Amino acid sequence: YYGISYGAVVGAVYSRLFPAHLRSLTLDSPDDPEAWFGAGRPDPLWARLGPAEYGEATLEDLFSACESAGSRCQWAPTIRADYEHVIEALRTERLTVPGTGSFDASAFQNTVVGALYRFNQNGRDDYETLLGLIHALAQVADGTAPDAEPASDDSVIGQQTRAGFGALSQDATVSRMLTVDAVVCADAHEPPQREAWFMSAAAAEADSPGFGYYWISQDSICNGWSAAGNRVEDSVGISDYGTIDVPFLVLSNAHDPVVGEWGADRVKGLGPRGEAVAVTDGWGHGVLRGSSC
């Protein structure tokens, strides 16, 4: 069995329910199953999993890698200042990059998170795209943007970035509710009070500016959701299924913006035959999905 992200949670549960059906497991960039189900825990799901902290750390690592590359990363001299400038400007105004699109704070953060998540999974360097976008937005903010050039499909800031923002269509909204929100709300224990999201979001935003509000809001739809497992007595934890008895391998990237580097070590402890491998120069969410190996 191979599972990535939430698929790894499914694999961890399945292996405990039906151990005779599996020879081995590979769990790639797994969410922590204990935190995912969260039986009896007072915080919302994404506060328990911690992607706000991991996302900020990955962005910091990206800036450091660019600076370490020197002249090989054309944005190295100004990238941190550019980012801070963009964040500050977006507090009060919308920024438009000619040939690319218009960004408010929410659209920009969605694009940042999406680029860190994907890495190079779409056949181009998402991180180079992101750095170029940050610099372009900073130029717009301070009025030094060059004259616009026609956008092309292979431009550094092009079609891929434009796809990262904007309101979802009705069909896409319904699809997300059925394939993401319904699963999350049915699986995870969530607090019954909506104030729990406000408090968790404020705390996460204070620790990881730009990422806290984004991530904690992702499961706020579960508050009041009729199928939500929001009663402690109805919540199931991964420990209720026993241990993983088959051999299993846990993979993680050192620069994973969703589960972090140390998630693999936690998941390895779910059974006596687990091993963890961390790719020290691995980026994005998913080791095998983005790997050329």
Q: Where on the chain are the PLM-derived regions?
A:
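Conserved alpha/beta-hydrolase "acid-adjacent" motif
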Residues: P257-W262
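Short glycine-rich catalytic loops that host catalytic nucleophiles or stabilize transition states
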Residues: V277-W283
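Short beta-strand/loop motif that positions the catalytic acidic residue
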Residues: T243-I244, L249-S252, D256
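Alpha/beta-hydrolase fold active-site neighborhood
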Residues: R80-G242
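Glycine-rich nucleophile elbow surrounding the catalytic serine of serine-hydrolase chemistry
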Residues: G3-V13
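A catalytic-pocket lid/entrance helix-loop region that shapes and gates access to the active site
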Residues: V13-T78, E128-Q159
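Loop/turn elements at helix/coil->beta-strand transitions in domains of secreted/extracellular proteins
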Residues: A20-R23, D245-P247, P272-E275
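Catalytic histidine-centered segment of alpha/beta-hydrolase-like enzymes
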Residues: W283-C293
